[in-house]
């Protein structure tokens, strides 16, 4: 099995505007919300290639529910650790090449431990894909502990 691990996934809110003027109300001409994050994108591509995978990592709140439901709707198996904080939202102004990334949720010690326990049960011969940024309060040594 292939496991894609997202420590700081997002809901990407992609909007298009005709113009962008400071100190003015700017109207969107289109909008789209999709699951985001490098490892989640890999899981989505694997699914399109007919390769099963399990998307895991941290998800919380309404945005986390949105991501999980979307992935399940696409036929991607999920096994995320539910967190108390809200999964981040990234804003992308499509035709202006502007990206504003949310910082991400705070992940408790217990939530981190739960993910590490899940990862410890991955079988030899399985593939792990770990991609993306770290949530703000997660120390980078978690990467060593995962590997």
Question: What do the PLM-derived regions correspond to, one by one?
Answer:
Residues 48-127:
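Conserved N-terminal subdomain of the carbohydrate kinase-like
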Residues 1-56, 66:
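Glycine-rich phosphate/adenosyl-contacting loop at the front of the ribokinase-like
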Residues 27-32, 102-104, 131:
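Glycine-rich phosphate-binding "P-loop"
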Residues 5-9, 58-61, 83, 133:
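Cofactor-binding loop segments of dinucleotide-utilizing enzymes, especially the Rossmann-like FAD-
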Residues 30-37, 86-88, 106-110, 141:
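Residues at secondary-structure transition points
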Residues 19-22, 71-74, 145-146:
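Short, solvent-exposed amphipathic alpha-helical segments in soluble enzyme
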Residues 127-147:
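Conserved beta-alpha-beta core of the PfkB/ribokinase-like small-molecule kinase fold
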């Amino acid at each position: 099995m292939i496991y894609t691990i997202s420590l700081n996934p997002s809901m990407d809110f992609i909007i298009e505007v005709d113009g962008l003027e400071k100190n003015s109300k700017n109207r969107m001409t289109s909008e789209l919300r999709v699951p985001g994050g490098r490892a989640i994108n890999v899981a989505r591509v694997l699914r399109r290639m007919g390769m099963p995978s399990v998307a895991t990592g941290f998800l919380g709140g309404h945005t986390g529910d949105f991501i999980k439901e979307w992935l399940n709707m696409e036929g991607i198996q999920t096994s995320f650790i539910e967190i108390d904080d809200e999964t981040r939202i990234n804003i992308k102004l499509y035709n202006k090449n502007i990206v504003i990334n949310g910082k991400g949720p705070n992940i408790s010690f217990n939530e981190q431990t739960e993910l590490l326990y899940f990862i410890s049960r991955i079988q030899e011969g399985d593939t792990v894909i770990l991609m993306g940024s770290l949530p703000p309060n997660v120390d980078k040594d978690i990467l060593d502990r995962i590997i």
